[in-house]
From Swiss-Prot:
Disulfide bonds: 70-96, 74-84, 128-206, 149-189, 177-201, 211-288, 232-271, 260-283, 305-383, 326-365, 354-377, 391-469, 412-452, 440-464, 487-606, 519-535, 614-681, 644-660, 671-699
Glycosylation sites: 294, 402, 568, 655
Subunit and interaction comment: Dimer of an alpha chain and a beta chain linked by a disulfide bond. Interacts with SRPX2; the interaction increases HGF mitogenic activity.
Name of the protein described by the UniProt record: Hepatocyte growth factor
Signal peptide (from-to): 1-31
All copies of domain Peptidase S1, residue ranges: 495-723
Amino acid sequence: MWVTKLLPLLVLQQLLLHLLLLPVAVPRAEGQKKRRNTLHEFKKSAKTTLIKEDPLLKIKTKKMNTADQCANRCIRNKGLPFTCKAFVFDKARKRCLWFPFNSMTSGVKKEFGHEFDLYENKDYIRNCIIGKGGSYKGTVSITKSGIKCQPWNSMIPHEHSFLPSSYRGKDLQENYCRNPRGEEGGPWCFTSNPEVRYEVCDIPQCSEVECMTCNGESYRGPMDHTESGKICQRWDHQTPHRHKFLPERYPDKGFDDNYCRNPDGKPRPWCYTLDPDTPWEYCAIKMCAHSTMNDTDVPMETTECIQGQGEGYRGTINTIWNGVPCQRWDSQYPHQHDITPENFKCKDLRENYCRNPDGAESPWCFTTDPNIRVGYCSQIPKCDVSSGQDCYRGNGKNYMGNLSKTRSGLTCSMWEKNMEDLHRHIFWEPDASKLNKNYCRNPDDDAHGPWCYTGNPLIPWDYCPIFRCEGDTTPTIVNLDHPVISCAKTKQLRVVNGIPTRTNVGWMVSLKYRNKHICGGSLIKESWILTARQCFPSRNRDLKDYEAWLGIHDVHGKGDEKRKQVLNVSQLVYGPEGSDLVLLKLARPAILDDFVSTIDLPNYGCTIPEKTTCSVYGWGYTGSINFDGLLRVAHLYIMGNEKCSQYHQGKVTLNESEICAGAENIVSGPCEGDYGGPLVCEQHKMRMVLGVIVPGRGCAIPNRPGIFVRVAYYAKWIHKIILTYKIQQS
């Protein structure tokens, strides 16, 4: 008060006004809490509701638009005559049902309901604590030494001041262990033993409920906080951070609620956070004592070939496909990285051997070439498929097995629900007697095997992981001397020794990863790009890092600013097994003009006559140290598969999914940096993309023609994808 006597009244008024106008500083944790979506505090059980057998248990219901609104009212107990422990959101009727009980309450049971989603407050059902356990509201009522707890509203045998009425919001119910003051040691209780006043309860930390093995890829525990204490963002939410790890898209990754997971091969489990300034952080989860792994978690170890994606490959191949030696995993030269033996202890990162520690498409390594960061060891053969597996003959149109999952793990959708979509892309009435339940089938005579529809709007359909029966193989040689079907209708691969081109190549695409050119591609529709699978080595890469540049001649966009179009990639669609193709769906359609155009696809199954002159395009390595960044073209002529095999000294046997082309006399052709680019041929004055550049066996080697993916063999698949996948409107 002495200050008011010393300061003139005017000065005091100005001081008070200044203090009132000062911005309020909100601590980070508190600020985060205010922005927090309360739905993160609930455990979701999809297509589930609760049925109460006890008529005395109350229920409150009201129409609301979203589950988030239901959660907000449940957490705040706003307008509810009880403490809300769970709620059900009726998606069909847009209605909330709030409960003072949950699935663990006596006289309550779960029941399937397609239109319902059950959300239970985690604090009331979790069997572990976070930090000091101040939020724990579970039902443990035994102390660490096994003594039964005294009820909180009782004074026998111990008198105390911890009455439920004095600690509202702390849930001092029954005789359950609690930590109302957030003290060290965790939840506790007064005991029923007159000799022991109180004792802590033996409730584990959530980080210790389930330990992790290896890098935690199989961790399915309940940890929902990062190692710095930040709350995890729900996997089925896109705020505050947008991401691609949607539960319906990755059903086998354990994306339950907002629990820590490791879907992309990081050193350990992590999660997106609710802090807008911190996209993601690692979680503190203890390692299992003996790092034992379930049999289902361990990839099959091989040394001479790769099984699946090669995650279990333990051989000694130590060069990438073109012979460049691998960098040691424990070295940071010439490439710095965090995929070290210390971070990936169970991935056998010995020496410089090819490995697949992060779930990429196949074994790979960092290379000793400073200009090539990563290379794939695609020269390692695939292991033979066991004849005992479920298999199909021909193209699988008569397959009648019971498999009902796609190659990406999605459950197939019932055929009867998708007949309208099926009729949209076939011109005959399918045999409904074969379309049993949701089993994999091939009603449209797809050349690449059985498939099914899914319930995922992002992936309307996909192939099933069924292989052709042993002994029933595709013909390996295509004789191009026979009458042919006309094709026309009424690390980086680079073109070596090509010449600069400014011809009309508006369909040519430069794919950028973090603003660096990595691959070529072809614009085949306004919203679709055809490129090579090797350009996207992992399904788990964030598509936000990729851009498609169109309308450019210079790979850096110099001088092309007015005509350049830069588009984001919204989705990858992987081609049939073994195709090496990828279709990219653009976030918005390209605008066709004088500088951007589409290129035609060939007729399905067509072949181009031998000695037809075609062209490959790319921005890759040119054989010169001073690469000018300009688009290059190299002219090649089509070569029959049998003759092509001879040029490769019989070491390569081509099949009908491949096409061969080589240069006449001069050393010219695609090389590192042009993956995904097109082999373009002209027939009846119509230019078409006949091939796609994929990793070969060296760059423009004399008398060694290039082998490309034959687009005509996959033309029906491309048309089917374009027809069935919805286009995002900008």
